[in-house]
Amino acid sequence: MLLLWALPLLLGAVAGLEVCYERLGCFGNRIPWSGGTLERPFSTLPSTPKIVNTRFLLYTNENPNNFQEISADASTIRGSNFRTDRKTRFIIHGFTDKGEENWLSNLCENLFQVETVNCICVDWKGGSRTTYPQATQNIRIVGAEVAYLVGTLQSSLGYSPSNIHVIGHSLGAHAAGEVGRRTNGTIGRITGLDPAEPYFQGTPEIVRLDPSDAQFVDVIHTDAAPMVPNLGFGMSQTVGHLDFFPNGGKEMPGCQKNVLSQIVDINGVWEGTRDFVACNHLRSYKYYADSIVNPNGFAGFSCASYTAFSANKCFPCSNGCPQMGHYADRFSRKTDGVGQTFYLNTGDSSNFARWRYQVAVTLSGRRVTGHVLVSLYGSKGNSKQYEIFTGLLKPGDTHLNEFDSDVDVGDVQKVKFVWYNNVINPTLPKVGASQITVEQNDGRVFKFCSTDTVREDILLTLTPC
């Protein structure tokens, strides 16, 4: 894949100025679309619609496993399981990918678990499996084809564009932007999954995804390190109303595995090889798929930077936490501005959802050197132990920390405290927690108290004060 991204820097060539197609209109290769700028040094026209061969693969709750191919011919839509009383979600893949790749249909399957929906996977492998600069031009054809289908839905079936959500990964995110531009921002929502950076970062809004392309635009950035020298394929530039940078947006947990373990992936050699080449870049659609079935597991925190977030300076959410992914549109202030930036942490495997808690522990008992851990027990489940503090344990001192649990414990009902010496202590001191306060990201606070102290490695249970 890296070769395909880099090769165009040597192979760009000057083409004609404009080409027109009856259904889709005209496409030129002048600035800002192509040639003459630092971001787009080569002049290239899109491939023909026949070569790009945009296809629409419809999955619904009635046919979740086998697609029905539809087109902008209204008769194919009426003869399918498409229903006008449902939302429609388009999914557009990126460079070198295809619409029949498992991740697109898997995303549809997750959607069917939580809603009744028309899920349309857009295949444009005829235009994506070429040199990278050519593919960046071919997304204009893809966007035009999707927009034409949206127009058919509106004119022939009375279907409102506001009921349409376009989800695009990599180059597909900018194809989604082209859909929005051609439909004058009437699309209900566009989600950009790590929008591609080369040939798009720093370009005018007309070329790339931007907030004016839909009534609401949300973006997940997972590979935002610079293309040179870090080989980051995704944009660092904010291009939505809400821009989420999980784990800081550059290096995703689980993407640092050794080469062999990553290629021989649990999902097979093909998926493992894809992960090895572009693990961070692919995480965006995996996070989105996981967010569908974890409605509150991807809370984003408004913060000046990921460094500030990691330093526990952004908790709780004073104006509420938007959820990264599928439920981002439930955030009441989603369109209060553009480029609203949010940070969060995720897991490193298939269960990416995390629930962040802030815990304050007030110590009692002896003065010793050691470290303190707590675990939460709640109405939905129990967390593992998380370290709150290490150092001098002094009675009366309060230590505060935040952690990301892989379990949503629900309403916290009790807390278990344990401590350990940092050095061997023959005096067998006892330490306790007179009070532990647990705060959730929505601002709810739970307080627990105890008058007991315990020796190291002995659990102390605190109950509500």
UniProtKB/Swiss-Prot annotation:
InterPro entries: AB_hydrolase_fold, Lipase, Lipase_LIPH, Lipase_N, Lipase_panc, PLAT/LH2_dom, PLAT/LH2_dom_sf, TAG_lipase
Domain of life: Eukaryota
One GO cellular component term noted in the UniProt record for this chain: extracellular space
Subcellular localization(s) per the UniProt record: Secreted
Active-site residues (renumbered): 170, 194, 281
Signal peptide: 1-16
The entry's keywords: Calcium, Disulfide bond, Hydrolase, Lipid degradation, Lipid metabolism, Metal-binding, Secreted, Signal
Ranges where the PLAT domain occurs: 355-465
Function: Plays an important role in fat metabolism. It preferentially splits the esters of long-chain fatty acids at positions 1 and 3, producing mainly 2-monoacylglycerol and free fatty acids, and shows considerably higher activity against insoluble emulsified substrates than against soluble ones.
Quaternary state and interactors: Forms a 1:1 stoichiometric complex with (pro)colipase/CLPS.
Protein name (Swiss-Prot/TrEMBL): Pancreatic triacylglycerol lipase
Organism: Oryctolagus cuniculus
Organism lineage string: Eukaryota, Metazoa, Chordata, Craniata, Vertebrata
